[in-house]
Amino acid sequence: MRLLISLPVLIVVLAMALEGPAPAQATPDLSSAFENLPEKLKEFGNTLEDKARAAIEHIKQKEILTKTRTWFSETFGKLKEKLKTTFD
């Protein structure tokens, strides 16, 4: 009984082994790797750009940072006015 079960299993395993790697598992040759390089670099650049924009938007929306930016703007404006009135 064991022999009857193991023979079909052995045949299937041998067929899979002799078939070779699946197309997804095959290693790409060097020329195809260089052909895809510009696409991959562009995709990487776009991803990096999106992440940078999201980080900048996140920083802009933080309340403490908005208050700090407003305070610096107001202080700089007051300093500018004071210097203008002092030297005019």
UniProtKB/Swiss-Prot annotation:
It is found in: Secreted. Its main location: secreted. InterPro entries: ApoC-1_sf, ApoC-I. Belongs to the apolipoprotein C1 family. The keyword Zinc does not apply. The gene is APOC1. GO terms for cellular component: endoplasmic reticulum; high-density lipoprotein particle; very-low-density lipoprotein particle. This is Apolipoprotein C-I. It comes from the Eukaryota. It comes from Mesocricetus auratus (Golden hamster). Disulfide bonds: none annotated. Keywords: Lipid transport, Secreted, Signal, Transport, VLDL. GO terms for biological process: cholesterol efflux; cholesterol metabolic process; chylomicron remnant clearance; lipoprotein metabolic process; negative regulation of cholesterol transport; negative regulation of fatty acid biosynthetic process; negative regulation of phosphatidylcholine catabolic process; negative regulation of receptor-mediated endocytosis. Inhibitor of lipoprotein binding to the low density lipoprotein (LDL) receptor, LDL receptor-related protein, and very low density lipoprotein (VLDL) receptor. Associates with high density lipoproteins (HDL) and the triacylglycerol-rich lipoproteins in the plasma and makes up about 10% of the protein of the VLDL and 2% of that of HDL. Appears to interfere directly with fatty acid uptake and is also the major plasma inhibitor of cholesteryl ester transfer protein (CETP). Residues 1-26 form the signal peptide. GO terms for molecular function: fatty acid binding; phospholipase inhibitor activity.
